[in-house]
Each structure stands twice: as C-alpha cells, then as structure tokens.
Amino acid sequence: MRMCTPIRGLLMALAVMFGTAMAFAPIPRITWEHREVHLVQFHEPDIYNYSALLLSEDKDTLYIGAREAVFAVNALNISEKQHEVYWKVSEDKKAKCAEKGKSKQTECLNYIRVLQPLSATSLYVCGTNAFQPACDHLNLTSFKFLGKNEDGKGRCPFDPAHSYTSVMVDGELYSGTSYNFLGSEPIISRNSSHSPLRTEYAIPWLNEPSFVFADVIRKSPDSPDGEDDRVYFFFTEVSVEYEFVFRVLIPRIARVCKGDQGGLRTLQKKWTSFLKARLICSRPDSGLVFNVLRDVFVLRSPGLKVPVFYALFTPQLNNVGLSAVCAYNLSTAEEVFSHGKYMQSTTVEQSHTKWVRYNGPVPKPRPGACIDSEARAANYTSSLNLPDKTLQFVKDHPLMDDSVTPIDNRPRLIKKDVNYTQIVVDRTQALDGTVYDVMFVSTDRGALHKAISLEHAVHIIEETQLFQDFEPVQTLLLSSKKGNRFVYAGSNSGVVQAPLAFCGKHGTCEDCVLARDPYCAWSPPTATCVALHQTESPSRGLIQEMSGDASVCPDKSKGSYRQHFFKHGGTAELKCSQKSNLARVFWKFQNGVLKAESPKYGLMGRKNLLIFNLSEGDSGVYQCLSEERVKNKTVFQVVAKHVLEVKVVPKPVVAPTLSVVQTEGSRIATKVLVASTQGSSPPTPAVQATSSGAITLPPKPAPTGTSCEPKIVINTVPQLHSEKTMYLKSSDNRLLMSLFLFFFVLFLCLFFYNCYKGYLPRQCLKFRSALLIGKKKPKSDFCDREQSLKETLVEPGSFSQQNGEHPKPALDTGYETEQDTITSKVPTDREDSQRIDDLSARDKPFDVKCELKFADSDADGD
C-alpha cells in the first residue's frame, strides 16, 4: 500500500482543501496599480501572442517572438524598437489548413514557438506555420530570414495550443513537443545533423505529457568522474503507476545525456539515457498534494555549488485556487537517477497499481547512466558500445521508483485564491550579508508577486499590476546584468518591462524598513529609499533591517501637517495615504482614539476619516496612525497629521438693521457688519461675504425721512452657489425643458392623428369640417358614401307600420333584394342629415349621447 501514497494524499486533499486553505493566505504588503508605477511597454498594432522572449545581455537586446513576427528591442528600454521581421503564412497554406477543420483566423497562422541562439550572428526560429511547422535561421546583422525552410516536425508543435519546450545546446536543439498533426505522439528529441535522437513511442516513456521547461546542466570542470553534460526536461503526464476511473496527473523530471548516440541494435536512434522520476511538492501536515507542474526556473549563482531549481505547482483539483512553489537541489535529482531503484510493469488483479518497485538484479553498466570514467575504464566509450541487456532494461524500465523531494520537505510558498503561471528567481545579498532568494511569480490576472522566505515564513513584499486588462502572463524573463536589473513579462497583447524594486515609492524610513525588501535601503543624507543594485555609492550609512525593526530609523523632527478650515455644521474628510495591506489604520484626536462606530465619525475606504456635523469642539489636531505586526512586534507609525479649525458664523444683529446672510458650501468665511441708520448718515455696507468668488453685496440706500421711528431693514444676500450646485441646477432646467418639449410634441402628434381619423367631439369635428369645406370632394368617396346610404337608410314610416314600434336604422344584413335597391330613392344631403337627426333623437342606444356621427362625412361640410 506504500505505492498508493500519492493517490491517498490526492484524495485527502479534497477533504481538507477548504479547511486548510485559510492558513495559506500570505497577503502582499503593498499593491501597486498599473498607473502608480513606471512600467515600460512594447506592443505593435495587430500583432499578438508575445510568448517567446530571448535576452542578449552582451548586446543589451531583447528578442521577442510573436504571431508571424520577430522583434529586436532595446533591453534597457523596450519601447525602443530596433529591428523587425515578419514571417507570414501564404494563402495557399491557410486554405489547406482550413480544409482540415482549423480556424483560418486564429489557428492557421504562424505562431513563433522556438527562439534560440544559434551563433553570435544568427537565431534559430521555428513557428507553427498553419499546422505545417517550419524552422529558419535569422541573420542578426541584416535581421532577415535566410530561407532555410527546414522541417519543424518534432521541433515545434503543429497546434499553437499544444505544449512545448526547447533549449539550444552547442548548436543542437533539444525539444519536447508533439510529433504529428493531432498531437497524439509526444516526443523528446535532439535535432542534430549527425546523431538525431528521440524517445521511444511507448506509454511507459511518455503518457500524454504537457511539457513545461528544459535546460542544460554543464558538468563540473573539476569533476573526477569525467561526467557528461545533462539536459533536463520538466513536464506533467498521466500516471502510468496507477489506473483509476479518472486520470491522475504526475509531475515529472526527465534526464538525457548530451553524449548519448543511441544504441547499435536496440534503441537505434533512440535515447539510451532517458530516465524520469516523480517530483514531490506537498504539505505533509495537511495532506495537500500539488501535482500539476506550471513552470520551472533553474537558479545558478556563484555562491551555489549545485544549481537549485524552483518549480511552480497547482493541485489537480484546484477548486479554491491554490498555488505552490517548491525548491529542489539538483543533486537530489541526480542521486535518484544515479543510485535510485527502478520500477517495472506488473499485473495485479483487483488493484489500481500497475507499476511496482523492481528488486531484481540490475545489469552493468547501469542502465540510463551517462558515459563516465568508470564506463570508459570498462571499455564502454560510447552508448553504441553498450550491451543489449543494458539497453533492453532501460527500454523497459524508464521510470524510477524513488522521488525527488523538495528542500526542507515543504513548499517555499503556498498562496490561495490565485493561479500562478510563471516564475523567475534572483539571489541577492542584504546589507547584513544574508543571502535571499527573491521569487518573482506572475498570475493569470496580469499581476507580479515578489516574495522571499524569512525564518520559515514567506513574505510577499509587493504585488504589481503589469497589464491593465488583467490578462495572463505567458512568459517571464529575468536580466542578470549588474546595474540594470529588470523583469520582462510577455502576454497576448504585449511585453512589459519592470524594475526589480520600486524603492523610491517608499517615502519614509519606516516604510523602507517595514517593506523588508533586500533590494532597498534608506539613505539618511538624501532622505530617500534607494535601490542597492542601482547605486554605486558605499553601503555605509544606509539603513536596512530585514527583521522589520523600524526603531533603527532616526527620530523624525516635528512632522509636517495640513491645516483645514471648515464651516460650522458641515462635514470634513481627512485623508490618510497608507499603502500597507498588513497595517491597521486608526485615528487619534486630542490623544484619544476615535471609534468609527460613533455616529459622529466614519471611515471612507477604511482609511480616510469623515467627521459629521462639525462644531467648535471638533477643532484640533487629528493624527492617522498605522499599526503593523512584524515578528510578534507591533510597529506604530504616524502616517498623516491634520489641523482642523471650525469657523463659527456669528448670529446677525437685528437692531436697528437686520442683515440675513445665507451661505452654501462647507468651506466659507463670512463677515457681518452692522450699520445704524440714525439721522441722515449714509448707510455702510451691511454684509460682506467672502468665498472663492469674493462676493460683496452692500444694501440699498435707505430713503431719508423726518420720521424718528426706527425702521427694520432686512437685507437678503443671494445664496452663494458652488460651481457644482449651479451645474446641477442648470442640468435640472435643461431636463425639465426637454421633458416639456417631448410631451408637447407627443400631444401635437396625437391631436393631428385623431383629427385626421375623426376621433374628436362634435365641436372639433365641425371645426374640422369648416376647415375642409373648401376642398374638392373625391369622386370615389362620394360614390362609396352614396352606396352606404342606399344600403343603410330606410323609410321610418314603413318601419313603424310593420312593427308598431319606433323606427330604427336598418342594418346591412346582406339580404337586400333587387326590388329594394331599384325602388330606393337617393336622398339629398339635407334629407340625410334631417333623417339621421330624427333617428338619433328617437333612439339613443344604452342612453349614451353619441356625439360621433358619420365622422367621415363631416369633411364634406354640413
């Protein structure tokens, strides 16, 4: 049952995922929006999918492979384009691609997938080429393709959506991709003119892999074993060890030797050194297993004896958005391949296990091993000399039983509610000599996280929004040139260049120290936070404390403050610009902490203070403070200081002259001057109102008279309106006028429509008839009306004689006889009108006075 441990961990992850995810929530201390920081961008119109990046630090040039185009830009400022070349697909190839069921607009194009250095003057470029992959050489001097038109099969995928990876080693391309149109035949190959090699087309070798990364590890110059260079491939594939109803994904690391030449009889033109092992990235205490590999970065540093590779994972059942980063020593992987146990295929009834550990004898030389000094001593100078027994064993046993475990047996970083896509790592040294591995991890929302490990805990220094449209980052590239350190990120819409740190954005020593950024230090002489990798001045006098102890900062002198004047009864908003997401902001007034629950105060955006219904007691000094926990210590910092003064408007005096002043706005200063009207002395201005408009309105001069009775004069000052208020009132007037015009036009339309149809009272119809009396009667209308009268009018006398009742107008029943029609007399207009009036007077249906009578005939005039 030991072999079922990965599956048991995977199933356990489902049960504990929601319970443990809450613990994996490191929050970025600072979040930089796209507009807040200086980012350099590169984008060409109608060009998309900037997924291939290659940096030449010697030439300070960044090569960008996109859809049907390759660009060369200045690596120090990628907005400066140096060269460009286009590689488009012919219309004939597009048509053939479309005939195979592919999209002519999105798939039948040339997506650049391989961009590798071939020599000092040329690049090796491969593209999908409308599902006919092709490769060519790009001359860097003329920046033109040489027209090689090599077959890209096995070097570049057919489908731009399929996974791929490649690395150029001494002029030979090592690639992992699909070998056919359908993408059903995966392959890891070496494209060489003298010794091309590939993997065996068998499920034990590669089972539906998703290729992620490839890199070469050079042999140590002082190695006594005379070992060979090794090329490592990283991918995720469907498990061959276990078989369930659902597919179980396993992250793998595979290795081949650079000096491999294939077998003589067995494994001809196939790898004889291909071995693969499982990568472990899990949280043992919670049972979480991260088994989908997303990206890998190999960290090389002068201080590292053995390279360290960082791998980015997500769980297969990622229903809560978990991502993890694990670090591995390359020596651990080499130990598994050199001395680990093999696995063999077996058939166990009623068991999900399909491969078990092989405990039998292992032939010599060791299967899958590179040719070293020991093999040469046994007269095996090449893989062509290896015995068939060794080659057959490695053909049947490509999978190792031992797994590659991470450093410290735990992930370096676990983050929930985010899907990481790419990773690069930089090793830097702080002022105290401590070395830190700074991880730059991109997300599927276009953001970049910068994180470090501090005493068995991860600290996300900052989050930077690289792309405004929140699109996924497809590739990351890190420059290592001293003095000019940048991160390059490629997406579907363009490339962004970002510095390693935004030290200058920290305005105080406390902010610079609390950031705990190994790239940043505080400079007391200049009172700025400087970037260590960009300064050439000595580090003496700089302040950096990776523990976050802000007490090392010098005591600040009396801090600056902002003074505000508000009107009595108004509302004040005091701003506090605290960027730290880890800090708690609170306000103090007169050495007392304000409570946001009070109806007097409120918080806007969790930082800005709102004070309602201002009074004299609200005048004073307000301080915004931040409280941040760092290593079980609480750091307090004064972020902002405001001095508030509430202006009290004195009540106007009503003897002998009453001045009433009405003001609007929260910030306004007023002066009220009282003038007496004794005798005939001239009056003085009663009111002076000063505001942004500086409005002064004196009262009208009072008429002189002989009466001694005091007169009460009320001088009303017009209200002072702010521009916003006047704009709103103007908008309201325009709105009312628009509504009035709309309903007026609607009324006219309805009126004329009813007038035309005749649906109006008798007075209106008579007026309409009077207007139309002079018009010529249409002949057809008269004939129709004459025929209608013939059919509907009968003699009232005959009708009453037959029934003994009051006569009623005869209805058109459709049974009129020819005799009735012949004997009918065509009445005149006057007779028609008289007869209709008599009929309507005698018979009013439902006792309703019908005012609409033969509206169509009114146009002819009464």
UniProtKB/Swiss-Prot annotation:
Task: List, as start-end ranges, the regions of compositional bias called Basic and acidic residues.
Answer: 827-837
Q: Name one GO molecular function term.
A: signaling receptor binding
Any idea which residues bear Phosphoserine here?
S833
What does the record say about tissue specificity?
Strongly expressed in skeletal muscle, peripheral blood lymphocytes, spleen, and thymus and also expressed at lower levels in testes, brain, kidney, small intestine, prostate, heart, placenta, lung and pancreas, but not in colon and liver.
Q: What is its main location?
A: membrane
Which positions fall inside the Ig-like C2-type domain?
A: 554-636
- Membrane topology, record value: Single-pass type I membrane protein
The residue ranges for the Cytoplasmic side of the membrane come to 756-862
Indicate the segments forming the PSI domain, all copies.
Answer: 502-551
Q: Which UniProt keywords apply?
A: Cell membrane, Developmental protein, Differentiation, Disulfide bond, Glycoprotein, Immunoglobulin domain, Membrane, Neurogenesis, Phosphoprotein, Receptor, Signal, Transmembrane, Transmembrane helix
Q: Domain Sema: where?
A: 22-500
Extracellular face residues: 22-734
Output one GO BP term: immune response
SMART domains linked: IG, IGc2, PSI, Sema
Q: Where are the transmembrane segments?
A: 735-755
Assembly description: Homodimer. Interacts with PLXNB2. Interacts with PLXNB1.
- Function in brief: Cell surface receptor for PLXNB1 and PLXNB2 that plays an important role in cell-cell signaling. Regulates GABAergic synapse development. Promotes the development of inhibitory synapses in a PLXNB1-dependent manner. Modulates the complexity and arborization of developing neurites in hippocampal neurons by activating PLXNB1 and interaction with PLXNB1 mediates activation of RHOA. Promotes the migration of cerebellar granule cells. Plays a role in the immune system; induces B-cells to aggregate and improves their viability (in vitro).
Sequence similarity:
Belongs to the semaphorin family.
UniProt protein name: Semaphorin-4D
What gene makes this protein?
SEMA4D
